[in-house]
UniProtKB/Swiss-Prot annotation:
Protein name per UniProt: Probable GTP-binding protein EngB
Residues binding Mg(2+): 41, 63
Cofactor(s) the protein requires to work: Mg(2+)
Stated family: Belongs to the TRAFAC class TrmE-Era-EngA-EngB-Septin-like GTPase superfamily. EngB GTPase family.
Amino acids binding GTP: 34-41, 61-65, 79-82, 146-149, 179-181
Lineage: Bacteria, Pseudomonadati, Pseudomonadota, Gammaproteobacteria, Vibrionales
Gene transcribed to yield this protein: engB
Keyword match Nucleotide-binding: yes
HAMAP family: GTPase_EngB
Length: 219
């Protein structure tokens, strides 16, 4: 028996400038990370079937806070600050990167990382750094090659195979799939992945359901 996760009920809880200002380190958190133009906000909105859960900005790099969303009791999604935008001051970039690294390496309830990257410009240095931080902390990673609708089917498959082959050399638990917020491509696969990562936090609900099931009258 499993508990159905209602992603459409996801709602914003709080923002924090760094890990020290986040709520208690408990339950299960899944973090979303990506370059400032990777389509992270659009992906979160598509995942939850909401138009403005995550605010999209026409000024990449503007979001400097860690944003926390509640999916179910004990299940949270964390929207990490976008990284790698050229027009952001170096001092601010360094502060963000320190905050991201600290979160990935020290947050005990972090059980999965989704790294989003534009399928036309995948695996930049900072993308790889995020993945390696997660691998070092034994956190599974789901890479989403976003804006997949921008490529024709053949080019899309070619890029997917190339990146999958590349991550095989990384070690760790790293999966790669294509994704399109516009077309809905890869949304079901993403939800299935998150379901498995959130499962430990929902185990007590499954146990309660089993206890409440009526006994069979069959002899």
């Amino acid at each position: 028996m499993s508990v159905k996760i209602h992603y459409q009920n996801t709602h914003f809880i709080t923002s924090a400038p760094d890990i020290r200002h986040l709520p208690e380190d408990e339950g299960v958190e899944i973090a979303f990370a990506g370059r400032s133009n990777a389509g992270k906000s659009s992906a979160l909105n598509r995942l939850t079937n909401q138009k403005s859960l995550a605010k999209t900005s026409k000024t990449p790099g503007r979001t400097q806070l860690i944003n926390l969303f509640k999916v179910e009791e004990g299940c949270h999604i964390v929207d990490l600050p976008g990284y790698g935008f050229a027009q952001v001051p170096v001092e601010m970039k360094n502060k963000w990167q320190k905050s991201l690294g600290e979160y990935l390496q020290k947050r005990e309830c972090l059980k999965g990382l989704v790294v989003l990257m534009d399928i036309r410009h995948p695996m930049k240095d900072l993308d790889q750094q995020m993945i390696f931080w997660a691998i070092d902390s034994r956190i599974p990673v789901q890479v989403l090659l976003t804006k997949a609708d921008k490529l024709k089917s053949g080019a899309r498959k070619q890029t997917l195979l190339k990146i999958r082959k590349q991550v095989e050399t990384f070690g760790g638990d790293v999966s790669v799939d294509v994704f399109s917020s516009l077309k809905g491509l890869g949304v079901d696969q993403l939800r299935a992945k998150l379901d498995t990562w959130f499962a430990p936090a929902l185990a007590h609900l499954i146990e309660e359901d089993d206890l409440e099931m009526p006994e069979s009258n069959e002899e």
